[in-house]
Regions:
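Hydrophobic alpha-helical segments and helix pairs
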Residues: 89-113, 117-118
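N-terminal membrane topogenic signal
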Residues: 2-27, 272-273
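Functionalized membrane-embedded alpha-helices
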Residues: 26-36, 44-76, 99, 117-133, ...
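Membrane-interfacial catalytic/cofactor-binding modules of polytopic membrane enzymes
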Residues: 127-212, 296-305, 310-311
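Final/C-terminal transmembrane alpha-helix of multipass membrane proteins
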Residues: 276-294
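Hydrophobic alpha-helical segments
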Residues: 249-277, 290
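Membrane-interfacial entry segments at the cytosolic side of transmembrane helices
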Residues: 112-119, 268-281
Length: 311
């Protein structure tokens, strides 16, 4: 155990002693290589972008070249124009990020430009999210989006089972109903989904929590650093990542935000930088580990033990 702790400490020191600019570039390249779903389903663009990213990892000098990132940004731009109507929003964000790296690496002070623009991209992402959700989508503010998601998305069924009294039969009914509605063979115009009042209440709570924390993040990252309140921006972004993606493991967007968060960290903020680095495997654990089923089994066992003890 002692040797394991020693190895982990040494690994942490190696990461923290890395050049911050190199760390950000490697994190971006790993994001592009390790998350194919972030690039969409078009194999041509995946092949080019991921191959370039592999080259950037294996040849660090290429990854620090402005020409490399101009090429990457150009490919992303062509992809965005070619498939704008089906492209996820985080791909547009990555397009801007590659352009940021290209411009920054063309200057004498790339670290400062990267940090400032990463902060700006985070703030703008959240302010536009709040604008769309809070002011332009009244159905969202009623909780309809999360209510529908909690009823029909298998990724969050564990939350409904553990916290809201949903059972597997209700979810199976909802999945079958949505499949029937989507089938071109069925002449069905509407279906009735099964839920619970607690699930509806949770949807409203999550809706307002999302708008509030995203609004706070927009404020923290767009305000100039001279305001004392901005000292909490990193903690707020980490809190958002640790809580949001536990409930909804959208790791692609989560890793993108964490990469931007890492990029805007002050060079002397070693502990904060380490927290951002450790968030990468944490979000991966959210995606791969059956966390909610394990919690459900633990809760069931605890309840059974309590009932047994009562008798």
């Amino acid at each position: 155990m002692h040797s394991l702790r020693k190895t982990a400490a040494r690994l942490g020191d190696m990461l923290l002693e890395s050049d911050p600019l190199d760390l950000v570039i490697r994190a971006t390249l790993l994001l592009l290589v390790g998350m194919p779903s972030i690039l969409g389903v078009e194999w041509q663009y995946q092949l080019i972008i991921r191959s370039l990213a592999v080259i950037g990892i294996l040849a660090p000098a290429a990854g620090r070249s402005a020409a490399f990132w101009w090429a990457m940004a150009t490919i992303f731009f062509v992809k965005s124009v070619d498939h704008w109507w089906i492209q996820d929003n985080h791909v547009f964000l990555l397009n801007w990020w590659c352009l940021t790296l290209a411009i920054a690496l063309s200057t004498a002070d790339p670290r400062r430009i990267i940090a400032a623009n990463a902060r700006l991209l985070i703030g703008l992402s959240f302010i536009f999210a709040v604008l769309w959700k809070g002011f332009l989508s009244p159905d969202y503010m009623r909780g309809d989006y999360f209510h529908f998601t909690f009823l029909t998305d298998s990724r969050v069924s564990g939350i409904g089972t553990l916290l809201c009294g949903m059972d597997p039969l209700q979810y199976r009914h909802n999945y079958d109903a949505m499949g029937l509605l989507a089938s071109y063979k069925a002449e069905v115009q509407s279906v009735q989904l099964e839920g619970t009042p607690v699930l509806r209440m949770l949807a409203v709570v999550v809706t307002w929590w999302t708008v509030l924390i995203e609004g706070a993040l927009a404020l923290l990252f767009l305000l100039p650093s001279k305001f004392r309140v901005t000292r909490g921006r990193n903690a707020a972004l980490l809190l958002f990542a640790w809580t949001t993606y536990l409930a909804m493991p959208i790791v692609t967007f989560g890793w993108t935000l964490i990469t931007l968060g890492l990029a805007q960290c002050d060079d002397g903020a070693r502990r904060t930088r380490l927290c951002f680095i450790l968030t990468y495997p944490l979000l991966l654990a959210y995606l791969l580990a059956p966390i909610w089923p394990m919690l459900n089994r633990a809760a069931s066992a605890l309840l059974a033990g309590s009932l047994g003890g009562a008798h």
